[in-house]
A protein has these predicted regions:
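A short, Lys/Arg-rich alpha-helix, primarily the initiator
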Residues: 1-20
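Conserved binding/catalytic microenvironments
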Residues: 3-5, 105, 110, 114-405
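The alpha-helix within a helix-turn-helix
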Residues: 17, 28, 58
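Short alpha-helical DNA-recognition segment
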Residues: 21-41
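DNA major-groove recognition helix of helix-turn-helix/homeodomain DNA-binding modules
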Residues: 32, 52-67
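Short C-terminal boundary/hinge segments that cap the last helix of small helical domains
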Residues: 62-77, 296
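Short, charged recognition helix plus adjacent turn
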Residues: 70-99
């Protein structure tokens, strides 16, 4: 199997810089990095390995971060063509349905809808099966709207179900490089939550909104998450769901401030989330967000990588037992972050490959669509050309559409 030259973030960066007619010096100054570092990024000698760097470069070039990650070019990765194709029907469903104004007012029997909703929450979403969710969610959105409108006996359950499916829709859209669609799903979720009269559900909707706008508008995401955390704070002691969302909102604030290069603020938000996680323990999995001690540990690794502290992840990961986490997607995210951190240390690059391979086995679509995982695999392939390229690394590159047989 021969290795082909993949389109990396660095290559897209150079192409867009030329298209903009901007010099290395101008873009480097706008992004807050040195000219030599930018040159090495463009040549593939260094990785774009954090949100803060990716978003700074995108802002300097006046493009969306997805233009640099090439999210719309992922159809060559194994299984991703079907996932992207399914987004079309999802977009139509989000456009055609409004609260109390469904696109189709007939709907399916509630028992059938409840079974489909259970499948989304217990199988498709935890597996990060974007293609599977793309096939199921459009019809489910329309049918749940019909039930919420025309069947008062099931209205509350249908509204809670709509929050779940809008969360799933936003998850699919965001990870497939459709941030506008994720924002539409989050706004729908907000309208639904307003009907539930529940601080925890309102906090969940605001969390989804902050997540949806995070990459294109990091300061706005921070403001939304911080405001929502303040609003739900009075309920933390009496409502377990509110406590979990309070923790998730502070973790979102920690990530946003890390991406904005404000490490002290990030650490403060992380400490607040840690305190809540210690009280929550295993949690009740409110909103299928999984907040608790183990998930906090996952986020601790994630935040360390984002702050450029990849050397810490090996030690941080030692105390984390992933076996109790039902969501394969969440475990895959952890192993991806572990691989990202380990890859920064030459001595641990084989461990990085093993971590990424574990992540891919758990949630293949999520990992193959992850721009940072793709960057790491590309970089490791480049570094390995002088030596024997491991079978695992070569296989991952092929399945990501980064290498040809």
């Amino acid at each position: 199997m021969d290795v082909e030259q993949p389109r990396t973030i660095g290559q897209r960066l150079r192409e867009i810089r030329y298209w903009r007619g901007k010099s290395l010096r101008v873009v480097a100054e706008l992004a807050g990095i040195s000219e030599s570092y930018l040159s090495r990024l463009e040549r593939g000698e260094r990785q774009v390995d954090s949100r803060s760097l990716l978003e700074a470069l995108a802002a300097a070039l006046e493009v969306a971060p997805t233009e640099l990650t090439g999210a719309h070019e992922l159809t060559s990765a194994k299984g991703m063509g079907e996932a992207h194709a399914a987004v079309v029907a999802l977009r139509v469903a989000l456009a055609d349905n409004e609260l109390d104004d469904p696109a189709d007012d007939t709907g399916r029997p509630w028992s059938e809808l409840a079974a489909t909703l259970h499948r989304v929450n217990s199988e498709l979403r935890p597996a990060a099966d974007y293609a599977g969710m793309g096939l199921v969610l459009p019809g489910l959105i329309t049918d749940l709207h019909a039930v919420a409108t025309g069947k008062p006996v099931h209205r509350h359950d249908a509204l809670v179900g709509l929050l779940d499916v809008y969360a799933a829709a936003g998850f699919v859209a965001k990870h497939l490089g459709e941030p506008d669609l994720a924002s539409v799903a989050a706004l729908h979720a907000r309208a639904v939550a307003a009907q539930l009269d529940s601080p925890a559900h309102s906090a969940l909707a605001e969390f989804l909104r902050a997540q949806a706008v995070s990459s294109p508008a990091r300061p706005r995401s921070l403001a939304l998450a911080a405001r929502a955390a303040d609003r739900v704070a009075p309920c933390v002691g009496s409502d377990p769901g509110a406590a979990e969302m309070y923790g998730m909102l502070h973790l979102t604030c920690a990530l946003n401030t890390a991406a904005l290069r404000r490490p002290a603020e990030s650490a403060d938000h992380q400490a607040e989330a840690a305190d809540v996680a210690a009280r929550v323990g295993s949690g009740i999995n409110f909103g299928h967000q999984g907040f608790g001690l183990v998930n906090y540990g996952f986020w601790e690794v994630h935040l360390a990588v984002e702050r450029g502290e990849g050397g810490k992840v090996r030690e941080l990961a030692r105390g984390i037992d992933t076996r109790g986490v039902a969501s394969a997607s969440r475990r895959a995210a952890f192993y991806t972050d572990l691989g990202r951190g380990l890859a920064t240390e030459r001595a641990y690059r084989q461990e990085a490959v093993a971590a990424l391979r574990t992540a891919e086995r758990l949630a293949p679509q999520r990992v193959r669509a992850n721009p940072f995982a793709r960057e790491i695999v590309t970089d490791l392939m480049r570094r390995a050309r002088r030596d024997a390229v491991s079978r695992e690394l070569r296989g991952m590159a092929y399945r990501m559409g980064l290498a040809a047989s």
